[in-house]
C-alpha cells in the first residue's frame, strides 16, 4: 500500500511529521479518510480526533480543537490551533498526554456539541495505549 507524508502543526510546533498509510480527520461535514493518491482539497476541521495508521498497522491518535487541512496526492498538511498527541513510552507519559488532552477538551467543551464523541474517542485511545 502506498504511503503519504503527514504533518500536523500548531502555533507551538510540530505534533506529527512522518509517513502514514491512511489518516482519518474530523471534517466540518463529518469524518473523512485520506489515502495516498487522494484528490486535492482544502477544508476546515472541527474538534475531534485524527487517527494515523502507520506502516506497521499501529494507529496513533491526535486530539485537536479546530483547524484546516490541505490534501494532495502525496501529502497531508494539518494546521490546528491546539493539539495533543496521545502517545508515550511509559505509563506516566501516557497519563500526562491524557491529562493534556482532557485540558484541551475542557477548553473547547462550550464551543462544540460533538464533544461527547471526542471524549469517547479519547477514552478508547487511552485504553488501547494502556
Curated annotation (Swiss-Prot):
Family named by the database record: Belongs to the ATPase epsilon chain family.
Pfam families: ATP-synt_DE_N
Keyword Transport attributed: yes
Membrane topology: Peripheral membrane protein
Subunit organization: F-type ATPases have 2 components, CF(1) - the catalytic core - and CF(0) - the membrane proton channel. CF(1) has five subunits: alpha(3), beta(3), gamma(1), delta(1), epsilon(1). CF(0) has three main subunits: a, b and c.
GO cellular component assignments: plasma membrane; proton-transporting ATP synthase complex
Gene responsible for this protein: atpC
Phylogenetic lineage: Bacteria, Pseudomonadati, Campylobacterota, Epsilonproteobacteria, Campylobacterales
GO molecular function: ATP binding; proton-transporting ATP synthase activity, rotational mechanism
Keyword terms: ATP synthesis, Cell inner membrane, Cell membrane, CF(1), Hydrogen ion transport, Ion transport, Membrane, Transport
Protein name: ATP synthase epsilon chain
Main location: membrane
Superkingdom of the source species: Bacteria
Record's function text: Produces ATP from ADP in the presence of a proton gradient across the membrane.
Protein species of origin: Sulfurimonas denitrificans (strain ATCC 33889 / DSM 1251) (Thiomicrospira denitrificans (strain ATCC 33889 / DSM 1251))
Keyword Cell division on entry: no
Intracellular or extracellular location(s): Cell inner membrane
Amino acid at each position: 500500500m502506498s504511503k503519504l507524508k503527514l504533518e500536523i502543526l500548531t502555533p507551538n510546533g510540530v505534533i506529527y511529521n512522518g509517513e502514514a498509510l491512511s489518516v482519518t480527520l474530523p471534517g466540518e461535514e463529518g469524518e473523512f479518510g485520506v489515502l495516498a493518491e487522494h484528490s486535492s482539497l482544502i477544508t476546515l476541521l472541527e474538534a475531534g480526533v485524527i487517527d494515523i495508521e502507520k506502516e506497521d498497522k499501529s494507529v496513533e491518535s491526535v486530539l485537536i480543537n479546530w483547524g484546516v487541512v490541505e490534501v494532495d496526492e502525496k501529502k497531508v498538511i494539518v494546521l490546528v490551533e491546539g493539539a495533543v498527541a496521545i502517545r508515550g513510552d511509559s505509563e506516566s507519559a501516557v497519563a500526562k498526554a491524557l491529562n493534556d488532552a482532557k485540558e484541551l477538551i475542557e477548553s473547547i467543551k462550550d464551543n462544540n456539541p460533538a464533544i461527547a464523541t471526542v471524549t469517547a474517542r479519547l477514552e478508547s485511545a487511552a485504553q488501547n495505549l494502556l
